[in-house]
Amino acid sequence: MTNIRKTHPLMKILNDTFIDLPTPSNISSWWNFGSLLALCLIMQILTGLFLAMHYTPDTSTAFSSVAHICRDVNYGWFIRYLHANGASMFFICLYAHIGRGLYYGSYMFQETWNIGVLLLLTVMATAFVGYVLPWGQMSFWGATVITNLLSAIPYIGTTLVEWIWGGFSVDKATLTRFFAFHFILPFIITALAAVHLLFLHETGSNNPTGIPSNMDMIPFHPYYTIKDILGALLLILTLLALTLFTPDLLGDPDNYTPANPLSTPAHIKPEWYFLFAYAILRSIPNKLGGVLALLLSILILIFIPMLQTSKQRSMMFRPFSQLLFWTLIADLLTLTWIGGQPVEHPYIIVGQLASILYFLLILVLMPTAGLIENKLLKW
């Protein structure tokens, strides 16, 4: 008799996705991040659900409801910090996953890649609206500053901002709708992730060499399930260490002060995972120019498959491209650091140079390196 997992309509889908899936035999630990992202998403939805049971999306009670969760709800402090630091782990996995895709040429699966970029934008939107909910100083002013950027759009900007706010400033209506968005978006992310996986399984996974691996495939289970479990344990260990020992390491102290529209914090800045984009935004003195640069810093990922000049897919055997890739990583770390610094000399010029280098590397230097490597190999 055929095994039920191969015949049952639902089990068959799960079987073809996680059990009998033919997988390249040589994929490294950089391929672990997909499953880690799934784990992060599940964890964020569960902790978020329990937080939503005690949170009130109202300007007069939001801050105190978060304090109530931390003080009076059983293990409320733990759930709250798991959720906050879980977001950081989510972005660490997300950036590692994108970095892997860039390095090994996984972006040549264009549908999978484009859904991935859409997923990145949705996760960023979710994190942004979620950051507003505790209604601390940085929540309020972060929301005010970032939503205000839309006013740079010619003609309709101001109307658009007031429409998003639901009034003439960030207020009760804004908080309520941001809570609604923050609740619904993770489910949209889940649906998009399923589509992402669907497109990936149309082509099969890439591998470190970038060479088709049809001739050497192994079943996903048990080889990669056990590998994913190891990755998951390391992720959980890191998250627990962060949550239990230094829960506020990545947060902002200003968020322990209730939101006050009459007092602006000295340095308004977003969470660490948005600092690179924030630095690019600030490095351009013009408001509209800054907004466009901010958008392009993320949307540039869509154009990467079109900028592929090398005849080799992966960077595994391309030393020039590797050097430029790691320069890009160093540049992003520099931008992240600059985004958290005040707007003064020498940070302004460093941020501007790092922003120029970011676009130069992706749009000019990396495609040129690909052409040079082709030439050196007489291809």
UniProtKB/Swiss-Prot annotation:
Heme b b562 binds at H83, H182. It is a multi-pass membrane protein. A ubiquinone binds at H201. One of its GO terms (molecular function) is metal ion binding. The chain crosses the membrane at residues 33-53, 77-98, 113-133, 178-198, 226-246, 288-308, 320-340, 347-367. Its main location: mitochondrion. It comes from the Eukaryota. PROSITE patterns: CYTB_CTER, CYTB_NTER. Heme b b566 binds at H97, H196. It is found in: Mitochondrion inner membrane. Keywords: Electron transport, Heme, Iron, Membrane, Metal-binding, Mitochondrion, Mitochondrion inner membrane, Respiratory chain, Transmembrane, Transmembrane helix, Transport, Ubiquinone. One of its GO terms (cellular component) is mitochondrial inner membrane. One of its GO terms (biological process) is mitochondrial electron transport, ubiquinol to cytochrome c. PANTHER family: CYTOCHROME B. Heme 1 (or BL or b562) is low-potential and absorbs at about 562 nm, and heme 2 (or BH or b566) is high-potential and absorbs at about 566 nm. Belongs to the cytochrome b family. Component of the ubiquinol-cytochrome c reductase complex (complex III or cytochrome b-c1 complex) that is part of the mitochondrial respiratory chain. The b-c1 complex mediates electron transfer from ubiquinol to cytochrome c. Contributes to the generation of a proton gradient across the mitochondrial membrane that is then used for ATP synthesis. The cytochrome bc1 complex contains 11 subunits: 3 respiratory subunits (MT-CYB, CYC1 and UQCRFS1), 2 core proteins (UQCRC1 and UQCRC2) and 6 low-molecular weight proteins (UQCRH/QCR6, UQCRB/QCR7, UQCRQ/QCR8, UQCR10/QCR9, UQCR11/QCR10 and a cleavage product of UQCRFS1). This cytochrome bc1 complex then forms a dimer. This is Cytochrome b. The lineage of its organism: Eukaryota, Metazoa, Chordata, Craniata, Vertebrata.
